[in-house]
Design a protein with these regions (language model features):
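N-terminal nucleophile
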Residues: 2-16, 20-121, 125
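Solvent-exposed, charged interface segments at domain starts and junctions
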Residues: 1-2, 130
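Conserved small/polar residues in nucleotide/adenosyl-binding loops
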Residues: 127-133
């Protein structure tokens, strides 16, 4: 990895997350999230969540939980926070946030809001059920 690249976790709706090495540029981050970026710092350690600034307004699909009552819409990136710069995740951070965001989540509508449930990215086949009809 060169000094102009950073190690991140890339999280897309309905897919397992990916560890990636990306150019440490605004353009690269905008391409991954599909638009202007917003940086959130939801945890006490030196980690940022970079998401699409208007993801919910633009109707991007719900992706993963953000806290206990909110969700991130569209693709997002988890990277290190170096103060004024984004930096690579450490091995420990990759381990922690890979566990947190590994599984895709489907959000089911309920009368009380959205209910998140872990899922797999593989399409479900019901052909085995038809054999018993």
């Amino acid at each position: 990895m060169s000094e102009n690249e950073i190690r991140v976790l890339y999280v897309q709706p309905g897919k397992y997350l990916e560890e990636r090495t990306i150019p440490n540029t605004l353009r690269a981050l905008q391409e991954l999230v599909g638009g202007d970026i917003e940086c959130c710092r939801p945890w006490r350690d030196s980690v940022c969540v970079i998401c699409n600034d208007s993801g919910k307004i633009d109707g991007l699909p719900p992706n993963r939980l953000y806290g206990h009552t909110d969700f991130l819409a569209g693709s997002f990136v988890v990277c290190g926070n170096g103060g004024e710069d984004f930096i690579s995740l450490t091995d420990r951070q990759v381990f922690l946030y890979e566990r947190l965001y590994h599984n895709p989540v489907v959000f089911l509508p309920t009368p009380h809001g959205l209910l998140p449930m872990k899922c797999t990215p593989e399409p479900v086949s019901y052909t085995h059920l038809r054999a018993h009809e």
